[in-house]
Amino acid sequence: MGNTSITIEFTSKFWPYFTLIHMILTLISLLIIITIMIAILNKLSEHKTFCNNTLELGQMHQINT
């Protein structure tokens, strides 16, 4: 029975640190996911504008000829 009280003291002592570390890790992972998504969206939009520019050039070439 004496062993359980030690574990309760141990968990209650380190519980705030555990929750703090958990929150920090969660925030970091969310930030990483958000930055990756933003980078992907930027690449997609750049690709889209590039495609639009090439299409416009092709149309201009057809009009000129």
UniProtKB/Swiss-Prot annotation:
GO BP, one annotated term: monoatomic ion transmembrane transport
Record topology, Virion surface segments: 45-65
A GO term for molecular function: channel activity
Localization of this protein: Virion membrane; Host cell membrane; Host Golgi apparatus membrane; Host endoplasmic reticulum membrane
Pfam families listed in its UniProt record: SHP
Domain of life: Viruses
Residues with glycosylation annotation: N52
Span list, region Interaction with small-molecule inhibitor: 38-43
Membrane topology of the entry: Single-pass type II membrane protein
Annotated Gene Ontology cellular component terms: host cell endoplasmic reticulum membrane; host cell Golgi membrane; host cell plasma membrane; membrane; virion membrane
Intravirion side: 1-20
PTM summary: Four species of SH have been detected in infected cell cytoplasm: a 7.5 kDa non-glycosylated form (SH0), a 13-15 kDa form that contains one or two N-linked carbohydrate side chains of the high-mannose type (SHg), a 21-30 kDa polylactosaminoglycan-modified form of the protein (SHp), and the isoform generated by alternative translational initiation. Of these different forms, SH0 is by far the most abundant protein detected during virus infection. Tyrosine phosphorylated.
Site keyed Involved in opening and closing mechanism of the pentameric structure: positions: H22
UniProt activity-regulation remark: Channel activity is inhibited by copper. Also inhibited by small-molecule pyronin B.
Oligomeric and partner information: Homopentamer forming a funnel-like pore. Interacts with glycoprotein G; this interaction occurs on the surface of virion particles and infected cells. Interacts with host BCAP31 (via C-terminus); this interaction is direct.
Name of the protein in question: Small hydrophobic protein
